[in-house]
Amino acid sequence: MAKFGRILFKLVLIFGVIFLLLSGLIWNGYLLQVPTLEKIQSFKLSQASEIYSSDSVLLGKMYFENRRCISIKEIPEKLTNCLVATEDSRFFEHNGVDLKGLIRVGVKTLLLAENSGGGSTITQQLVKNRYPRSSFKNTNLLFHKVREWFTAMKVERLYSKNQIIEYYLNTVPFGHNCFGIYTASGYYFNKTPAQLEIQEMATLIGLLKGTSQYDPERNPKKSTNRRNLILRNMHEQGYLQKGELKKAIKTKLILASAEERELSIAPFFLQHIKIKVQNILSSINKSEYLHLNPYTDGLKLYTTIDSRVQKHAESALKNHLIILQKQFDAEWNERRWDNNKSTLLQLIRLKRYKGHKKVISLLESGSAFSPKIEEQLKTMKTDLTRLRAGFTCIKNTGEVLAWVGGRDFGYSQYDHVKSTRQVGSVFKPIVYATAVDQGVSICNYF
């Protein structure tokens, strides 16, 4: 018996040494491509750059990932509790890897053949978001898991629990190209995280399990069920009183409207300014010490546009075009040639008309074009009679206060402010005024 004990002790010792050796190699990145401490510290999240008017109104954004990072001070404690109760109830107890959770997963999955409910901690999820499995050559699931465990422990060594919560909530996607809790709060509820109510927090945290499946717009029933489950978990773990639970479950969820989400101020100007920003930064980035990317670096870009003047300009252009359109239609929609036979006969004799007649006969027979194309041709014909205009308001200093490139940016992105059409008679007052300044009499002929 004593001999068996010595053999067992030696085996345990040997395996222990091997385990420690492998752990050291993995920890230092010699095996499984585990990120180093320096690489983890140097990680930077992509943030959207925001474009503002001169009166500090957000006009639009430039981004690859629509994200704005916030500090833990801007994240309410209830939101942290909601996340912990849902994703990692022992978050404040483990060192990045929840051994109890792993045992539970193993027992349920292997022995009981039940759904284990997942075993990844918040820190491990953060690691997966930062370093996706697809970025590593080895595709073995076990190797991925071991890599995540060691990386999670490194993250816990570098950052406090609050910092990990902060990084996690700034990293995760919430659907609709919303990354991070700040952008998601604004998109779904038109609020900042600090303004969210508990049922709204639970709805957003519920999206982490599946952004499409639990989308409150597309799948309101599934979203509500998920939200209520999260609220009950919070109550069971002592984060929510019974009265708060009942109130939150009964409260109807009010999502932000499309108008609240849409940044529709000065769209033509934004189209122009985004190109300008890239050109300006290209010249600045020639310095070896500075390289700025408007789509990833979270810049704040301020313009001369005044949102109040812009709104008045857009309204004035639309209203005036309505009046002019009515006048145009009354004047030009009439088929005057029907009342003048001689003009009609002259038109029919033209070679150009004969060419059009062949096309018209093909359209009428249906032998050349599909109904869809014919409908598009009708739309194009209607467009020919639609009046277009552009408008700018510029101070004597050269600052652009308003920029209206057309009637409807959603319908046509052609910017009439930048168009190179001939000015026509609009230029005559400039010529005449210059002539008068030069002493030329208005009675002179040239």
Where are the language model's segments positioned?
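Short, well-structured active-site flanking segments
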Residues: 92-102, 179-181, 241-244, 436-446
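Short extracytoplasmic
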Residues: 42-68
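Flexible, acidic/glycine-enriched loop-and-adjacent beta/alpha segments
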Residues: 71-122, 182
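N-terminal post-signal-peptidase region of extra-cytosolic proteins
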Residues: 36-37, 63-72, 86, 149
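N-terminal type II signal-anchor transmembrane helix
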Residues: 1-52, 90, 109-110, 324
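Residue-level preference for non-acidic, small/hydrophobic
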Residues: 21, 56, 83, 126, ...
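Non-catalytic, structured segments within soluble enzyme domains
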Residues: 23, 115-346
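Short pre-catalytic segments that frame enzyme active sites
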Residues: 60-68, 183, 212, 216, ...
